[in-house]
């Protein structure tokens, strides 16, 4: 039996370094190639030794697909292609292709130029890697080769994020990457058609969370920021360059304008300009409201939000700063946090998920003393708030996607083991499908039922529909009767009449014959007349004919009477019928065996 194998090289019962290997129909596809922000050694990269022991991946992989530009999904791409060795195609959407190299270069500068780390990719490697990228359009079916095809769907989450359907023959897999089932201030909700894949591989970051009202969260966020600046404190909001940053900037910009507030709001230098450029360039990826108003008013040109200079961090008085990256693991956000952590007037608001090992994760878990580089200890006195503006699907959203796609099997990645276990049970109970949650390096094998596509002739379809009843769908299948014709390796279901005509054949008639013996003193003609009268009284809804040639006809059934030569009173009744009337023929033979009424 054919099967599909799925092996997480990263993000198996874990969040970070997303990298899923899928083997389907003899093809090997790598889904995402991310980096783990909680590690500073080789553990930050996926373990490619599961694929091959002798280095290069080109001979093994048919293609690599990147779902979006976040570093936990694309951060290891130059390492994989240029240092381990891969020359094949890398697929991603146009916005991801544009933004991905900028974020990779920013992270490389922090890691290599500032921290002095070795065994890391260079600027040239990023450029060489991006030359291998093939851009994807939404809903466009791309033929990777003669057998493998891929198709991208809108995922929300961040600009350019996509879910991907992979098909080889009749087998298919859908990989969600990160997605969001609710629209926000700048992006739409994820959408996929009822593609019924053999496996749906879904993220499960918020596997046990059902978020409260977005409006309540926004109100709480604005209240906390306002209260902090009113008492003279500083607010740090760690964000990733594109995504939640724009969402919260639009929110604060509107609030500052309405309340006529004067406290300065800053954003990491350069990133606002870049964000603005890409949102203009890829306006079709934003939500309907922004697309409609973009010509008159660009939502991303902020009046109250200015570019940040590192010297501003020491300025007295209140301020709000959006700084990257979002998990406080490096860069400007971490530098500002170190400066402001000692003052209880200040506040840090964490708007998204933080992986284990990052400073963000530590302070959210209540750590008040942090060991920094060089064995220095940092006392955390500022207020720490977690407000989920994360653009990941919650438990409700994941269930909604399953209802949309109707997969035959489910596989969870990109989440914490305990939470995944809870969601796994819920999915199996509600949808009666198998759900898997493999750890890193663990292979899940799913046996598929090969389906054979069949074209149905229009005439046959019209005839079936004329019979009435509900239209067929996945939950209410309908049996269709016809003749299968195989020609040029394709199958068609047609009516038997059409099949005979196309093949130039004559229809054969299959008939059954039955003899019934009956004692009757009357002549053969009288006996036949009595049979006719009896059948007329029993079969009131049928057309019954008494033909002059000495036969009675009911539908296709022919009845004749002859006498036995040895015994004139013994009549032999001969019944003959076609296979369509087999049920009626059996009924009549049983009826006549009981005799005729006197």
From Swiss-Prot:
Pfam family, one: RMMBL
Record's function text: RNA endonuclease component of the integrator complex, a multiprotein complex that terminates RNA polymerase II (Pol II) transcription in the promoter-proximal region of genes.
SUPFAM superfamilies registered for this protein in UniProt: Metallo-hydrolase/oxidoreductase
Any GO molecular function: RNA endonuclease activity
Top-level lineage group: Eukaryota
Coiled-coil regions listed in the entry: none
Localization terms from the record: Nucleus; Cytoplasm
Record: active site: 203
Keywords, comma-separated and alphabetical: Cytoplasm, Hydrolase, Metal-binding, Nucleus, Zinc
Family, as annotated: Belongs to the metallo-beta-lactamase superfamily. RNA-metabolizing metallo-beta-lactamase-like family. INTS11 subfamily.
Binding site for Zn(2+) 1: 68, 70, 157, 178
Cofactors: Zn(2+)
Originating species: Danio rerio
GO biological process terms on file: regulation of RNA splicing; RNA polymerase II transcription initiation surveillance; snRNA 3'-end processing; snRNA processing
Chain positions of motif Nuclear localization signal: 470-480
Residue positions binding Zn(2+) 2: 72-73, 178, 414
The name this protein goes by in its record: Integrator complex subunit 11
Oligomer and partners: Component of the Integrator complex, composed of core subunits INTS1, INTS2, INTS3, INTS4, INTS5, INTS6, INTS7, INTS8, INTS9/RC74, INTS10, INTS11/CPSF3L, INTS12, INTS13, INTS14 and INTS15. The core complex associates with protein phosphatase 2A subunits PPP2CA and PPP2R1A, to form the Integrator-PP2A (INTAC) complex. INTS11 is part of the RNA endonuclease subcomplex, composed of INTS4, INTS9, INTS11 and inositol hexakisphosphate (InsP6).
GO cellular component: a single term: nucleus
